[in-house]
């Protein structure tokens, strides 16, 4: 568990935070440049020193301004991966990985190297590596120090799109197989969507929202970040069944289900899906003989006018689903809070 209750002033920028983060999964730190994202993880890592408050990791006090406690970075058991890999140029990859490696990680070396796909790189110098390869080595080096917490400061920011696509699957694999909590700084919605379990939104050094990804994603705090044509719902689902005759998989959403193209995931596996509001249409009665496979019973929570369109907030199985319709459709269907209807979903994408 990471307890953050401190304030810090750097120049004209002030960061104030009072949150407790669980000791598992990935928490994305999100916001514009200057919002306080890097300042936050620098304070946690010990690179900067808050003037007030405390930082406590798993019961160990890292900072306590009142008591004059401020552990040095090497005593915090916190790994840090920077935007640039910062590898030692005169050491081969193997030497970079073993630098600072904890004794407890010696037996984990081969497993971690395989997990990150860097076996072929062990005898190469950093100068011969691509940007994505360097970042994989940097992540491996940080993990081999046996940290209780891993900080990643926009690790994909300096990479071009092909290299980002190369590294993203390795980060996803780490989230599944390495039981170390991570704080992931980013201003990329795509990275957050594919990696984060929770999101903390910072603005001018203040926490504007903090919670599960699907909750924060659907909140008004994210509206400025989401283009109107990309308003969407993020939903947690589980694999229910695989169709015996067609290449389709059913996902459980409350007591209803969604059909998607066949997945290789086992039954009961937890997944996260994204549904664009523009891919959801509404009808008052269940349609007959339709090509749309996913028709869910839903209740209208509210509706909002938005630049000539209407955003309809629906409840399906205790979760929020958004639909975008025209004012004409709203009036003809008499959309109002409490109305029960059917949501036809044309497309579903798997995000994690």
Curated annotation (Swiss-Prot):
Superkingdom of the organism of origin: Bacteria
Claim: Nucleotide-binding is one of the keywords in the record: yes
Coiled coil region boundaries: none
Alphabetical keyword list: ATP-binding, Cell inner membrane, Cell membrane, Membrane, Molybdenum, Nucleotide-binding, Translocase, Transport
SMART domains: AAA
Listed GO MF terms: ABC-type molybdate transporter activity; ATP binding; ATP hydrolysis activity
Positions annotated to bind ATP: 31-38
EC number: 7.3.2.5
One Pfam family from the record: ABC_tran
Keyword Membrane among record annotations: yes
Catalytic activities: molybdate(out) + ATP + H2O = molybdate(in) + ADP + phosphate + H(+)
Cellular component terms (Gene Ontology): plasma membrane
Localization terms from the record: Cell inner membrane
Topology with respect to the bilayer: Peripheral membrane protein
Domain Mop: 289-352
Residue intervals of the ABC transporter domain: 1-229
Matching NCBIfam families: modC_ABC, Mop, PRK11144.1
Subunit structure of this chain's protein: The complex is composed of two ATP-binding proteins (ModC), two transmembrane proteins (ModB) and a solute-binding protein (ModA).
Functional summary from the UniProt entry: Part of the ABC transporter complex ModABC involved in molybdenum import. Responsible for energy coupling to the transport system.
UniProt similarity note: Belongs to the ABC transporter superfamily. Molybdate importer (TC 3.A.1.8) family.
The protein's name in its UniProt record: Molybdenum import ATP-binding protein ModC
Organism this protein belongs to: Escherichia coli O6:H1 (strain CFT073 / ATCC 700928 / UPEC)
Gene name in the database record: modC
């Amino acid at each position: 568990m990471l307890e953050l209750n401190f304030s810090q002033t750097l120049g004209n920028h002030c960061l104030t935070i009072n949150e407790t983060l669980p000791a598992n999964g990935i928490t994305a730190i999100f916001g514009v440049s200057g919002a306080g994202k890097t300042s936050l993880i620098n304070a946690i890592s010990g690179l900067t020193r808050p003037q007030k408050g405390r930082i406590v990791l798993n019961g160990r006090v890292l900072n306590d301004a009142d008591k004059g406690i401020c552990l040095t970075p090497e005593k915090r058991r916190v790994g840090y991966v920077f935007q640039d890999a910062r590898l030692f140029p005169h050491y081969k990859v193997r030497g970079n990985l073993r630098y600072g490696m904890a004794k407890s990680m010696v037996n984990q070396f081969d497993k971690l190297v395989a997990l990150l796909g860097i076996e072929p790189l062990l005898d190469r110098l950093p100068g011969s590596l691509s940007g994505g390869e360097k970042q994989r080595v940097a992540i491996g080096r940080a993990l081999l120090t046996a940290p209780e917490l891993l900080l990643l400061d926009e690790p994909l920011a300096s990479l071009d799109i092909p290299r980002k696509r190369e590294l993203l699957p390795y980060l996803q694999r780490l989230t599944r197989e390495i039981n170390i909590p991570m704080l992931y700084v980013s201003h990329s919605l795509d990275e957050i969507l594919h990696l984060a379990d929770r999101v903390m939104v910072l603005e001018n050094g203040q926490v504007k929202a903090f919670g599960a990804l699907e909750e924060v994603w659907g909140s008004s705090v994210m509206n400025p970040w989401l283009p109107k044509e990309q308003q969407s719902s993020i939903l947690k689902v589980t694999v229910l069944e695989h169709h015996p005759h067609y290449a389709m998989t059913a996902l459980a959403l409350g007591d209803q289900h969604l059909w998607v193209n066949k997945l290789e995931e086992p039954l009961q596996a937890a997944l996260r899906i994204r549904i664009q509001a523009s891919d959801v249409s509404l009808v008052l009665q269940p349609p007959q003989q339709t090509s749309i496979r996913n028709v869910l019973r839903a209740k209208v929570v509210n509706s909002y006018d938005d630049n000539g369109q209407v955003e309809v907030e629906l409840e399906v199985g205790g979760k929020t689903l958004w639909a975008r319709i025209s004012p004409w459709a709203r009036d003809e269907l008499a959309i109002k809070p409490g109305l029960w209807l059917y949501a036809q979903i044309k497309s579903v994408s798997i995000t994690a």
